[in-house]
């Protein structure tokens, strides 16, 4: 039983990671090429829901605060590493056009 709980928790964490990648970069997992596309879509939707709920919980928590420049994690308004190639601003945070 504990092994199954572990797999569910790890699967949820991977789905949440994919959700965070989608929200930060606009890149999505190309699941339409697989026969299990419907199942994969539901799995990714589960990750989206868990990620959204986690963010809401963190924002309400007294244990978290906004990042300051003195924290040493880079600039606050930095959008991450420099992107090469195409400008990513053309993509919305919800839907991405794939080449």
Curated annotation (Swiss-Prot):
Give the transmembrane region(s): none
Alphabetized UniProt keyword annotations: Cytoplasm, Signal
CC terms in the record's Gene Ontology section: cytoplasm
Where in or outside the cell it occurs: the entry states: Cytoplasm
**Which first-to-last residue range defines the signal peptide?**
1-19
InterPro entries according to UniProt: Mitofissin (IPR013726)
On whether Cytoplasm is a keyword of this UniProt record, the answer is yes
Residue segments, region Disordered? 71-99
Pfam families, per database record: Mitofissin (PF08520)
Does the record carry DNA damage as a key word? no
Q: What else is known?
A: Present with 358 molecules/cell in log phase SD medium.
Name of the protein in question:
Uncharacterized protein YKL018C-A
Q: What organism, scientifically named, is this protein from?
A: Saccharomyces cerevisiae (strain ATCC 204508 / S288c)
Taxonomic lineage: Eukaryota, Fungi, Dikarya, Ascomycota, Saccharomycotina
């Amino acid at each position: 039983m504990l092994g199954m709980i572990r797999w569910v928790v790890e699967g949820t964490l991977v789905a949440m990671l994919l959700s965070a990648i989608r929200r930060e970069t606009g890149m999505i997992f190309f699941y339409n090429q697989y026969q299990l596309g419907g199942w994969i879509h539901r799995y990714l939707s589960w990750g989206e829901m868990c990620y959204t709920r986690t963010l809401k919980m963190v924002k309400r928590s007294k244990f978290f605060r906004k990042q300051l420049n003195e924290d040493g994690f880079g600039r606050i308004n930095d959008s991450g590493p420099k992107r090469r190639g195409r400008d990513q601003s053309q993509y919305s945070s919800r839907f991405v056009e794939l080449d």
